[in-house]
């Protein structure tokens, strides 16, 4: 279950970083910012049908797989640092976790971070223009299916640089305030 989180630093970002006392983020909190989460059962014989339904629902036509771990990813530490930098994209971010565990952090309307723990079978939809970041948990091993509407552009706009100036950010803010 998602929750509002305490400040995370690069040193502790792979920990839960829960507030004390804990404050869960319910489905309505995520819905308000355009985030959707569901489950995909990889042990079900119909898993491909479930994936096809997600692909159709979100009008995706391209996918790939990424394995985030020290053994398979060159410059692992640098990549994790990039993933954890607060950023946004022009396109939606859709991920299905096939193996391992990690955290997607997204900004609530009041600028607090909401942490979404993900593990095998979790599907996450982040709308275009939302500030977010990602990290693995301490296992440092995640395999994710990435779904795209077109071939990936991989353009990230960091908040500290020019993210707020992007037209997609303005559109996102309009969409979530409606």
Swiss-Prot record:
Q: Which Pfam families match?
A: ARD
Task: Enumerate the Gene Ontology biological process terms.
Answer: L-methionine salvage from methylthioadenosine; methionine metabolic process
Residues reported to bind Fe(2+): 87, 89, 93, 132
Which amino acids does the record list as binding Ni(2+)?
A: 87, 89, 93, 132
Q: In which pathway does it act?
A: Amino-acid biosynthesis; L-methionine biosynthesis via salvage pathway; L-methionine from S-methyl-5-thio-alpha-D-ribose 1-phosphate: step 5/6
- Keywords of the record: Amino-acid biosynthesis, Cytoplasm, Dioxygenase, Iron, Metal-binding, Methionine biosynthesis, Nickel, Nucleus, Oxidoreductase
For this chain's record, the cofactor binding note is: Binds either 1 Fe or Ni cation per monomer. Iron-binding promotes an acireductone dioxygenase reaction producing 2-keto-4-methylthiobutyrate, while nickel-binding promotes an acireductone dioxygenase reaction producing 3-(methylsulfanyl)propanoate.
Location within or outside the cell: Cytoplasm; Nucleus
One cellular component term from this protein's GO annotations in UniProt: cytoplasm
One GO term in the molecular function aspect is: iron ion binding
User: What EC identifiers does the entry list?
Assistant: 1.13.11.54, 1.13.11.53
Q: What family is reported?
A: Belongs to the acireductone dioxygenase (ARD) family.
- Give a short account of what the protein does: Catalyzes 2 different reactions between oxygen and the acireductone 1,2-dihydroxy-3-keto-5-methylthiopentene (DHK-MTPene) depending upon the metal bound in the active site. Fe-containing acireductone dioxygenase (Fe-ARD) produces formate and 2-keto-4-methylthiobutyrate (KMTB), the alpha-ketoacid precursor of methionine in the methionine recycle pathway. Ni-containing acireductone dioxygenase (Ni-ARD) produces methylthiopropionate, carbon monoxide and formate, and does not lie on the methionine recycle pathway.
**Which PANTHER family would you find in this protein's record?**
ACIREDUCTONE DIOXYGENASE (PTHR23418:SF0)
Q: Write down what this protein is called.
A: Acireductone dioxygenase 1
Query: Which organism does this sequence originate in?
Result: Caenorhabditis briggsae
Task: Give the source lineage, highest ranks first.
Answer: Eukaryota, Metazoa, Ecdysozoa, Nematoda, Chromadorea
């Amino acid at each position: 279950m998602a929750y509002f989180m305490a400040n995370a630093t690069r040193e502790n970002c792979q920990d839960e970083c829960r507030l004390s006392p804990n404050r869960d983020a319910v489905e309505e909190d995520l819905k308000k910012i355009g985030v959707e989460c569901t489950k995909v059962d990889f042990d079900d014989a119909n898993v491909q049908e479930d994936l096809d339904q997600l692909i159709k629902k979100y009008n995706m036509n391209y996918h790939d797989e990424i394995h985030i771990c020290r053994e398979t990813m060159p410059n692992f530490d640098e990549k994790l640092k990039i993933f954890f930098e607060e950023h946004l994209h022009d396109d939606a971010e859709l991920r299905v976790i096939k193996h391992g565990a990690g955290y997607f952090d997204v900004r609530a309307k009041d600028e607090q971070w909401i942490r979404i723990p993900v593990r095998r079978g979790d599907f996450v939809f982040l709308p275009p223009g939302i500030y977010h970041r990602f990290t693995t948990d301490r296992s440092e091993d995640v395999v994710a299916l990435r779904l795209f509407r077109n071939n990936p552009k991989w353009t990230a706009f960091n908040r500290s640089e020019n993210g707020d100036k992007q037209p997609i950010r303005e559109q996102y803010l309009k969409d979530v305030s409606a």
